[in-house]
Amino acid sequence: MISYVKGILVEKAKDRIVVESGMMGIGIFVPMSVLEVLPPLGEEVKIYTHLQVREDDMSLYGFLSRSDLEMFRQLLGVNGIGPKGALGILSALRPEDLRLAVMTGDAKAISRAPGVGAKTAQRIIL
């Protein structure tokens, strides 16, 4: 398990970043909410990570706080939501907005995320 990556931010792309740590450049998928608040390239960052291992793929997903990482992991526990779907939800809704929508039962707000229909939004709330 890789709990976090700390190093120099060397690249930003549409849905991922690269952090140079030691002698490695580590690619990490991140939601838009993270991309929007990252420091400029060349600055140090600390990204809390979730390592997703599949038969043919290993991917890191990253967040600025442990609580946002935990929200991502809770979304992974919802039937029908994989890591890319969870990342899409957290890109469409800031983690605090998603928490509020879940607490108030606002399925309409959750279903605004791409690929999330009414049934999936209800499963997230439950």
Where are these regions (language model features)?
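Residue-level recognition of specific faces of alpha-helices
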Residues: 1, 71-77, 86-89, 101, ...
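Structure-specific DNA junction-binding interface
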Residues: 1-77
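Short, flexible helix/strand-to-coil boundary loops that buttress conserved ligand/catalytic motifs
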Residues: 39, 102, 114
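Amphipathic, charged-and-aliphatic alpha-helical interface segments
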Residues: 51, 58-63, 83-102, 123-126
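Glycine- and Gly-Pro-enriched alpha-helical subdomains that act as flexible
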Residues: 111-114, 124
